[in-house]
Structures are given as C-alpha cells and as structure tokens.
Amino acid sequence: VVGSTTNSEIALLLDWNSWWALELDSRPSTLLRQRTFLLDYYRHFFELGYSVDFAHPEQDLSKYKLVIAPNLYLATDKAVSNIRKAISSGVNFVLGAFSIAVDEDEGVRPGGHLIDLRDLFGAYSEEWSPLYADGAVNLVDSSGKLVGKSDGWAEYMKLAPDAEVVL
C-alpha cells in the first residue's frame, strides 16, 4: 500500500567493501560468494513471512531483534564497535563463516580472528578450512549426534573456557 511502512525486526548486514574484498582471487576459497549467503538467508525468512531489512554494519542496529551477518569478511573498527554495542544491548546476532577476518585496510587484526568480540561470542575460529567444491563435513553436537552438514567451508572453533555449549 502506497505510503505504508514495515518495521522489520530482522536485519541482514551488507557492506559493499566487504563483499568486494571477500570475492578477490587471493582468498582461501573462490566458493565463498556474498550474493549466495545473502539470498540463502533472505529467502528463508521471506518464505516464513518475515520482513527483512538490509543494514550497514556501522548503522544503528538497536531496533532489530535479530541481526545476521552471513559474511562480513572485512569490518571497520566502527563496525566492530557497533556490533559489540548491539549485542551488549540485547540484539541477537548471528555471525557467518569467514567474518571479521580483516580491518578496512585488509590487515589481519592484531591478536587474531574476532579478537574484539571473543568475549561476547565465547568462541573464535582457530583455523579456516576451505573444502573442495564437492566436499562436505558433518556437524555434530557435543554428544557426537549428527545435526547437519556444511559444504564449501569449515572452521575449527576454539571455545572460551567459560563458554556454555548449547547445540
């Protein structure tokens, strides 16, 4: 209806500089494609009847109940600070594969992956492991039960000593 508005409670983070940097040839895998990540998430919520906004990682995220960064390979210090603020204020946040790997100059952050957000996530990638185009790995919970599969990409995660596993 003309003039009407929607108030989305879900946002997908989109940063053009990060998209461009992710898809350079020098990355560990050419299978990581921002468009695919975004469409997979968007399609899922659309089919369930949810309205979804696209938001820049530096904009105010406090109005959302759920913010998803399907991939945010390159993140400015301002974006990292803004994500911290959103999570600290109670926004639910999902961070996808190979995210917050480098700063705005494509420099690896001193201290390693997710150094500025490890305390909030309770985990970080210790090692990235791109898979072959037809490769897949099993996802298992702490009891060893199969809960899914991943194709194209895997990450070896390190948990914080006080982190609670909920999967």
Regions found by a protein language model. Give the residues of each.
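Generic preference for well-ordered secondary structure
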Residues: 29, 36, 51, 67, ...
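Aromatic-Pro/Gly-enriched surface loop or interdomain linker
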Residues: 1-63
